[in-house]
Amino acid sequence: MIMRFGYVSHAMALWDCSPAKTMTFTSFQKLSKQEREDKLYDVTRQNLEHTIRILHYNIAHEIPLYRLSSSIVPLATHPEVEFDYIGLFTPLWRTIGALIKEHNLRVSFHPNQFTLFTSDKPHITTNAITDMTYHYKVLDAIGIADSSYINIHVGGAYGNKEKAVERFHDNIKKLPAHIKRRMTLENDDKTYTTAETLSICQKEKIPFVFDYHHHMANLCEEPLEELLPAIFETWSHTNIVPKVHISSPKSKKEFRAHAEYIDLEFIKPFLHVAKKINHNFDIMIESKQKDLAMLQFIHELSSIRGVKRISSSTLQW
């Protein structure tokens, strides 16, 4: 069983390298037309240049997974902001794409919790489609739209989970097919359990990104030993291995909040279940300390008897 690792957005080890510098619409409104264009250009350029720095860092540390920041382009989906964020930065997008392809990196997006398809309000679905389209356009500009995924949660229950799931199946039909093909779903920590999310993924033929921390915060009746093989099976029609999310609770009181680092003892039960299946999979670390937490966790995990470190960020067990 081979496990490859990655982290989310910011490389904590790099100084002043945020790929998610932003600009509020309020501050945007206060500027003249030229100042708006200049500010949007400068912030986006900086985010892209920082992303390139981060990718070089990942390559140097043999980190094969990385989640791009959804905020890489400020105000990209705001209805009152017009900005050619693709055409203006074609060379930078291509540089990012070249690095990803040359080093065979697995790159993804994870829009925020407001991108959902369970609402009975049409504008919420419209906004979700707009946001998914933005993420797809960025992947396409990079040149990896046919091999990367955009991960979201199922959404809210709105007092009736059964009807909300029905709306999901109806609303998702409005998402262009080429974008839906690049979509994954994740179980959440309050509403949709692992079993419920799995059922939706199986019906829609959407790969399931399993989050172990969320699973432990929102348990279902079915044991993980039964669920995990079926979760991995949702990836069978793709040409890549399954991906899971890992983080640890901040505390017993704040169980859903992410800790700074990974608690190996919290994760061990999941790893033992995965070992019995003996299927290769990728792990996205979602701890607050990001790359630092990832590297520390790999070091701790590699000390377990039978676990072999085969590269800086890849283990075999």
Curated annotation (Swiss-Prot):
NCBIfam families: uvde
Entry coiled-coil feature ranges: none
Keyword terms: DNA damage, DNA excision, DNA repair, Endonuclease, Hydrolase, Nuclease
Similarity-based family: Belongs to the uve1/UvsE family.
Species of origin: Bacillus cereus (strain Q1)
Originating gene: uvsE
Molecular functions (GO terms): endonuclease activity
EC numbers on record: 3.-.-.-
Name of the featured protein: UV DNA damage endonuclease
Pfam families from the UniProt entry: UvdE (PF03851)
GO biological process: one example: response to UV
InterPro entries in the cross-refs: UvdE, UvdE_bac, Xyl_isomerase-like_sf
